[in-house]
Regions:
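Bacterial Sec-dependent N-terminal signal peptides
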Residues: 1-27, 31-35
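N-terminal targeting or regulatory segments adjacent to alpha/beta-hydrolase or S9 domains
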Residues: 21-108
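Glycine-rich active-site/cofactor-binding loop and its immediate structural neighborhood
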Residues: 101-159
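Mobile cap/lid helix-loop segments that gate and shape the active-site cleft of serine hydrolases
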Residues: 210-211, 217-218, 226, 272-311
Length: 311
């Protein structure tokens, strides 16, 4: 008798679940809205989505600003960027050191080490025209997601699994620059390339940016703040080189690399120009309109955790 009752209850629950599943139509939930007459929202997602929609950034660009207002706006954006990037003040670290020089056809390839934190080392690559006479413009090249400084200079990766299609001119940004007579400097993004962890053994270019980003968020910092801080050290090194024109330093970024590129462009007035190789969008608007559930019945979010900045 007990078993029959259990089977009956299971059957009823199953029918209810099937009924609910059959009644669910994802397209009807593509736009976030209230089912109540008073317009109030019950879903936590819907509530925080409404908060985001009603957020008005303090330094959002306003068309029609006067020259004076525009200058004040620039200064405000720069001050806010300093605050949210949270660059540490670390002193008494060793100066960068050239650890390898290799002559190539028409240019010189150098590998440099620098020491941004105690107990840390990072690297960058420099391409210099072979017959360099006097100072020339310099270009700081930043790779996109899953890419490396080695690919930018047209060289194999530090291991087979991190080797890209480096002979492709759409990949070898820095190599293209030195062929035009510029000094090109290439860096890795945080947690990628030579700065990655275990990827050489298994995942290859599918870098685990997220775990590093989580650690940094726990520290009150961010992936972008960390990456931009390292890139700023390299930029400052470039300014100190006699063969690079300080008044003609350009930053060029691919995809993910456009983010630290924009940070440096805001913070450093000496940057002459930057080359933005990515799509453009209004980030807040993108987050507001991307609400349609995906095939796993989850609402999407436009950016991964590596793009998040506290504050």
């Amino acid at each position: 008798m007990i078993m029959k009752r259990l089977l009956f209850l299971v059957s009823v629950c199953s029918l209810c679940m099937v009924g609910n599943s059959q009644n669910y139509q994802p397209e009807k939930h593509a736009v976030v809205k209230s089912d109540r007459g008073d317009g109030r929202l019950l879903s936590t997602y819907a509530i925080v989505h409404e908060m985001l929609k009603d957020t008005h950034p303090q330094y959002a660009y306003r068309s029609g600003m006067s020259a004076q207002e525009f200058t004040q706006w620039q200064d405000g954006v720069r001050a806010a960027m300093v605050e949210i990037m949270k660059f540490p003040e670390i002193k008494r670290q060793p100066s960068p050191v050239c650890v390898k020089t290799e002559k190539k056809e028409g240019y010189i390839l150098e590998k440099w080490e620098f020491y941004p934190f105690p107990k840390s080392v990072s690297t960058f690559l420099v391409l210099k025209p072979e017959h360099l006479k006097g100072a020339v413009p310099g270009v700081l090249c930043i790779p996109g997601s899953g890419r490396t400084k080695e690919g930018l200079v047209g060289e194999p990766g530090i291991c087979d699994k991190l080797t890209e299609d480096y002979n492709n001119p759409k990949v070898s940004m820095a190599l293209n620059m030195v062929k035009e007579g510029y000094v090109a400097v290439a860096v890795d993004n945080a947690a990628a390339g030579e700065a990655s962890d275990l990827e050489c053994y298994d995942k290859g270019w599918n870098y685990d940016y997220d775990v590093v980003s989580r650690f940094l968020l726990e520290l009150g910092w961010s992936w972008l703040g960390y990456t931009s801080y390292l890139d700023m050290q390299v930029l400052n090194w470039m300014k100190a080189q006699s063969y690079i024109r300080k008044d003609r330093i350009v930053i060029s970024g691919f995809s993910l690399g456009t983010e630290p590129m924009m940070v440096l462009g805001v913070l450093d007035k000496d940057i002459y120009a930057f080359v933005y190789n990515d799509f453009l969008c209004q980030t807040q608007e993108r987050a507001v309109v991307m609400t349609k559930p995906d095939k796993e019945n989850r609402r999407p979010f436009p950016n991964s955790i590596r793009h998040l900045i506290p504050g």
